[in-house]
Amino acid sequence: ANVYGNFYGTPKKDVIQWLDDGIDVILEIDVQGALQVKKSYPEGVFIFILPPSIEELKNRIKARGSETEETMARRLGTVLQEISLIDQYDYRVINEDLEVAINRVRAIITAEQCKLNDSEVDRIVRRYKEEL
């Protein structure tokens, strides 16, 4: 995906292999990338993590020292567009305090792991019927 003039991506075959191996895959991607992944994996769980304010976003980008003024301006110019797509995500986490945000993401992962898919439910129901 082209993000602020740079190209990023995660090899699809790696992701498929990890999923096949039962590994939870976490992708740190922008909105454009997340929507592309969601088309291929609608059953995925999507978490929108955002800072508490634009001012805080600016401070964090500056503190990294990895963005030029031009790149930062371009990035900030897309913030409203990206936030307008927040309803495409399953969860939202405001990263005001890093530890709190990490714990919320962990809680989301744990909750999602507790969900049974239809085939698991069918298997359990069949076992119940066999045991009765």
What residue spans do the PLM features occupy?
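Short phosphate-engaging motifs
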Residues: 33, 53, 100-101
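NTP-dependent small-molecule kinase module
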Residues: 66, 81-132
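ATP-dependent small-molecule kinase phosphotransfer cores
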Residues: 1-25, 31-35
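Ras-like small GTPase catalytic G-domain
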Residues: 42-44, 56, 64-84, 96-100
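Conserved phosphate-donor/acceptor-positioning beta-strand/loop module used by diverse small-molecule
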Residues: 25-30, 39-63, 95
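Conserved catalytic network of the ASCE P-loop NTPase/AAA+ motor domain
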Residues: 17-20, 38-42, 84-86
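Flexible beta-alpha connector loops of hexameric P-loop NTPases
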Residues: 1-5, 61-70
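Alpha-helical scaffold elements adjacent to nucleotide-binding pockets in ATP/GTP-utilizing enzyme cores
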Residues: 14, 60, 104-107
